Amino acid sequence: MAAYKLELSNQAERVIRRMAEREPALYQRVAGALDDLRRDPHQGKPLKGELRGRYSYRVGSYRIVYLVRRQELLVLVIDIGHRRDIYR
């Protein structure tokens, strides 16, 4: 299976930068998870309702919400956040 290209939304980039500065251990775990998603983007949980078509991937109590564009071999990370806030 070919590796997918990973692209971050502006929101996801802001979260990653802030996380790298304030919570380096969590940043390392999220960076590892993003690499896993690049290799196999379908390991996340498909979302329902208004978020249909998107996936969620768990990193402890944090979630990575993303889209998979199979035609382009692209994983588009929409947002990263704590599970209590991410789906709002």
Where do the model's predicted regions map?
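Basic, Lys/Arg-enriched alpha-helical interface segments
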Residues: 1-61, 69-74, 78-80, 85-88
